[in-house]
Regions:
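Histidine-dependent nucleotide/RNA phosphoesterase domain, centered on the 2H-phosphoesterase fold
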Residues: 1-238
Length: 238
């Protein structure tokens, strides 16, 4: 049994009984902090959004629609807890560390190998096609130094994108469980990215539903730290 299997096994009884985790709008000190993420390529992002739309037929409304194509992502590392106003000096340090780490890796490829349930979400499961993703994760932790405190001692051992975060009752729990179970090994293709992004998240509740929109504070292409180092981030000078 792998980690994705264990998550499915853990989540199933919680969802069936209505005891699943529920997201709420972020507050200072909570989830959805400044993070380093990878985005799927556009074609893959559209496939993941389609999967989210199908999930919603069973989950119902009121959940966080994190699988929309311009929001879906793979988290490399969370860097702090949520705060409404970002610390510009911290952002400069995070960006510099991300650039240095990216210099040591090439494009990161992920095979999207199926869906699973977690206590608070529906996930797309991914397997790295080589060691670039793991190397970037390790290099980033090293380059952050003291700024690596948020995930100190934590080793992310799976790659995933959450396409729906539960935030309300699930309309058809049994139907959702069965639907995901039938797609545990559904191939959603391969995605590759040569760009890492430093992002913060903004909560929206509007005509498109409840969203967590990433705002790009900085980005860097793999192996190109030396070429980008002099440019500005959205939060200020590097």
């Amino acid at each position: 049994m792998n980690a994705f299997d264990r998550l499915f096994t853990e989540a199933t009884p919680l969802i069936r009984q209505g005891l699943h985790q529920r997201e709420s709008a972020p507050v200072d000190g909570g989830r959805w902090p400044v993070s380093v993420v990878l985005r799927p390529d556009r074609a893959a992002a559209e496939r993941l959004e389609q999967a989210m739309t199908e999930v919603e037929e069973y989950a119902g409304s009121g959940h966080f629609r994190t699988g929309v194509a311009d929001s879906v992502h793979f988290t490399v590392r969370a860097l702090e807890t949520f705060r409404e106003t970002v610390d510009e000096e911290a952002v400069r340090r995070y960006a510099a560390a991300m650039h240095r780490a990216a210099a040591g890796v090439e494009s990161i490829g992920l095979d999207l190998v199926g869906l699973t349930l977690a206590p608070g979400s529906v996930m797309v499961c991914a397997h790295p096609v080589d060691d670039n993703g793991e190397r970037f994760m390790d290099l980033l932790g090293d380059e952050l130094g003291d700024d690596a405190w948020r995930e100190a001692g934590l080793r992310r051992d799976i790659w995933y994108a959450s396409i729906l975060h539960f935030a309300a009752d699930i309309a058809m729990p049994a139907g959702l469980i069965e639907w995901v179970a039938q797609r545990r090994e559904l191939s959603l293709g391969r995605t590759a990215t040569d760009t890492a992004e430093l992002v913060r998240f903004h909560y929206e509740d509007g005509p498109s539903g409840r969203l967590m929109r990433p705002e790009i504070l900085d980005s860097v292409r793999a192996g190109q730290f030396g070429q980008d180092n002099s440019r500005q981030t959205k939060a200020g000078l590097m």
